[in-house]
Amino acid sequence: MVLDELISEFDRGLRSLTGISRMSRPVPVPADTPDVELTPAERTHAAGLMRVNHVGEVCAQALYQAQKLTARTASAKAMFEEAAREEEDHLAWTAHRLKELDSRPSLLNPLWYAGALAIGVAAGTLGDKVSLGFMAETERQVESHLEGHMSELPPTDTASRAIVDQMRIDEVKHGKAATDAGGIELPLPARMLMRAASKVMTSTAYYL
């Protein structure tokens, strides 16, 4: 059983890094909004933001894979699995949008994935309450990050905005579920360290 689980997660990791993630929900589309041609500068900026979002989803896959494998209860494992499935949709959506913008994922995705996997293992070894608390804090920070992107994306880029908005809705749900399941609030130094690490990732992934 453990071997089957490891093989399944290894397969998911490969799909995350190779850009062939499976999509269980269709790509969100704007409601009744005509397509507007973006300027070259707008396309470049939107692509940078969506690349950052794609990296975030690569990291989410690694985090939740590691946390699922180290979880001590069946309920925690199920929660990490459900979140990972929805995050896999986000991964596919952002990859799809990057292609539409004639851009590419981050060249450093293997590095981001490996780092997030290590962090997920560390969080998981501290117990389910800490691991769920880490999930809740991660989702809160991602929610804030996505809200910032909604204000930064060109108003005419309705395709990217529809994707980001649905991602934000899902992140709020994941964070609340983790808290309701008993996740504890992380100490301030841990939350600050998470923000600092996120800033390094987002500022780098925008370009690379």
Curated annotation (Swiss-Prot):
Family membership noted in the UniProt record: Belongs to the COQ7 family.
InterPro entries: COQ7_proteobact, Ferritin-like, Ferritin-like_SF, Ubq_synth_Coq7
Name by which UniProt lists this protein: 3-demethoxyubiquinol 3-hydroxylase
GO BP annotations, alphabetical order: ubiquinone biosynthetic process
Cellular location(s): Cell membrane
Designated gene of the protein: coq7
Disulphide connectivity of cysteines: none
Binding site for Fe cation 1: 57, 87, 90, 171
Enzyme Commission number, as recorded: 1.14.99.60
PANTHER family: 5-DEMETHOXYUBIQUINONE HYDROXYLASE, MITOCHONDRIAL, COENZYME Q10 BIOSYNTHESIS PROTEIN 7
Reaction(s) this enzyme catalyzes, per UniProt: a 5-methoxy-2-methyl-3-(all-trans-polyprenyl)benzene-1,4-diol + AH2 + O2 = a 3-demethylubiquinol + A + H2O
Organism: Burkholderia cenocepacia (strain HI2424)
UniProt-annotated binding residues for Fe cation 2: 87, 139, 171, 174
Pathway: Cofactor biosynthesis; ubiquinone biosynthesis
Cofactor binding annotation: Binds 2 iron ions per subunit.
Main localization (coarse): membrane
Keyword Transmembrane helix among UniProt keywords: no
Transmembrane segments: none
GO molecular function per UniProt: 3-demethoxyubiquinol 3-hydroxylase activity; metal ion binding
GO cellular component terms given for this protein: plasma membrane
Purpose of the protein: Catalyzes the hydroxylation of 2-nonaprenyl-3-methyl-6-methoxy-1,4-benzoquinol during ubiquinone biosynthesis.
Cofactor(s) of this protein: Fe cation
Stored CDD domains: DMQH
